[in-house]
Amino acid sequence: MIALIQRVSRASVVVDNQTIGAIDKGLLVLLGVEREDNREKMEKLATKVMSYRVFSDENGKMNLNLTQAGGSLLVVSQFTLAADTGRGLRPSFSGAGTPEQALGLYEEFVAFCRAQGVTTETGQFGADMKVELVNDGPVTFNLQV
């Protein structure tokens, strides 16, 4: 399971010219599901995302996690993160989870984060989305479990 996280000062997702999810300070999470992923990996990754210290403390050091910084999550499904780009000039998605598997783990990821008390907005699984963000830093990390 893969989460490309970006520290943002604001981010939003638009589907059919309608904003369906938006946050101010927090993390934009692009979430990719691979075939071997399961609930255990999902919980481990969600915990890591929420606990990862990417926000600056009073000394300007990246030392605060999402909750400590008072941030929110915007979680967007992103199957292309599971692409194999090692050969040729076209990505292979043979390692990506099935749509059913990915939808289930995506929904569980969101529910798990919300259950921890984190304000969590979402995109729309499988939709053509327009994601707008202001990357703060920029700060971007690729987390995998």
Curated annotation (Swiss-Prot):
It comes from Shewanella sp. (strain MR-4). Belongs to the DTD family. Homodimer. Signal peptide: none annotated. A Gly-cisPro motif from one monomer fits into the active site of the other monomer to allow specific chiral rejection of L-amino acids. It is found in: Cytoplasm. A motif (Gly-cisPro motif, important for rejection of L-amino acids) lies at residues 137-138. GO terms for biological process: D-amino acid catabolic process. It catalyses: glycyl-tRNA(Ala) + H2O = tRNA(Ala) + glycine + H(+); a D-aminoacyl-tRNA + H2O = a tRNA + a D-alpha-amino acid + H(+). Gene3D superfamilies: D-tyrosyl-tRNA(Tyr) deacylase. Its main location: cytoplasm. NCBIfam families: D-aminoacyl-tRNA deacylase. InterPro entries: Daa-tRNA_deacyls_DTD (IPR003732), DTD-like_sf (IPR023509). One of its GO terms (cellular component) is cytoplasm. This is D-aminoacyl-tRNA deacylase. It is an enzyme of class 3 (hydrolase).
